[in-house]
Amino acid sequence: MKILVIGAGPAGLVFASQLKQARPLWAIDIVEKNDEQEVLGWGVVLPGRPGQHPANPLSYLDAPERLNPQFLEDFKLVHHNEPSLMSTGVLLCGVERRGLVHALRDKCRSQGIAIRFESPLLEHGELPLADYDLVVLANGVNHKTAHFTEALVPQVDYGRNKYIWYGTSQLFDQMNLVFRTHGKDIFIAHAYKYSDTMSTFIVECSEETYARARLGEMSEEASAEYVAKVFQAELGGHGLVSQPGLGWRNFMTLSHDRCHDGKLVLLGDALQSGHFSIGHGTTMAVVVAQLLVKALCTEDGVPAALKRFEERALPLVQLFRGHADNSRVWFETVEERMHLSSAEFVQSFDARRKSLPPMPEALAQNLRYALQR
């Protein structure tokens, strides 16, 4: 079996590494459009402790402690400057995204999987399908699947809020969610530490707030300073740091009604992206990657494997989208609920996804199935 993985992010790397472990004689190549050092993002949240939770990609590394994971069990929601403290319900693990990606790449290389960077494959819209038995598209929300097959053209929707992903040297020992009224405007911050020295700090606001504050007219530095003043109570004098390519934008939800076509199969955000407010993106990437490994290892041939993979993965992907969309819309319409008491506000926040089957249980059930090979 000869397999090409497009995209050297968590989804493609976990898939390649786990499949190579299960089928060491199969040939697996990975190509990535960016250079080796170009990894966007600050911290990501993962479930459980490495080695104890198979949905945590750190569990597949030989020395996960080198990434200095941070463990979070408490959740703080601030509404009208009044904090409400809660339990996350599960142990969460914050880690630097760049460090995670580099460690997963090293793991693949140690297994004999070649990774080629700055690959022009996607730019030309042509894939060497004749050279491979399977091509895995795991190259994120900006993938150009439409160049390859009409059946996998994504459905793309944009959220109403603007958001930006910052880093900060202020350390947040809890999962923090802050709703801050600033004049006529409302800003929302999602913050948590991912190392001994840094935290993720995601900020979102309505299009109207973004326009009134003239954030689109500011430089990256001026915008970061403005937002830092809005959240000065939380940041305590620490600044906000931006990355090139992570400026203000509307959240893009990318979806598909199917997972594969011919030799092509989708993984990770290339299959389904989900709003950052539910925090399951990397976990989804791991679970769905394991489902594909399971199908390839237990079914007779690629067509049968992809059929079985879609039967298992698509319902999970659709549930993930439902949770993410419900959560995104709640945040986009939060102004309607800012008048509530803090207790009522927390209750509304907790209820925003209660109409759907629980996501953690669905992930756990599918992962247990995938690991029975």
Swiss-Prot record:
EC number: 1.14.13.217
Cofactor(s) named in the record: FAD
InterPro entries: FAD/NAD-bd_sf (IPR036188), PheA/TfdB_FAD_monoxygenase (IPR050631)
GO biological process, one term: antibiotic biosynthetic process
Pathway: Pigment biosynthesis; violacein biosynthesis
Sorted UniProt keywords: Antibiotic biosynthesis, FAD, Flavoprotein, Monooxygenase, NAD, NADP, Oxidoreductase
Biotechnological exploitation: Violacein production is used as a biosensor for the detection of quorum-sensing AHL production. Violacein possesses antibacterial, antiviral, antimicrobial, antileishmanial, trypanocidal and potential antitumoral activities.
Claim: Transferase is one of the keywords in the record: no
Catalysed conversion reaction: protodeoxyviolaceinate + NADH + O2 + H(+) = protoviolaceinate + NAD(+) + H2O; protodeoxyviolaceinate + NADPH + O2 + H(+) = protoviolaceinate + NADP(+) + H2O
Top-level taxon of the source organism: Bacteria
Upregulation: By N-acylhomoserine lactone (AHL).
Name this polypeptide is given: Protodeoxyviolaceinate monooxygenase
Gene name tied to this protein: vioD
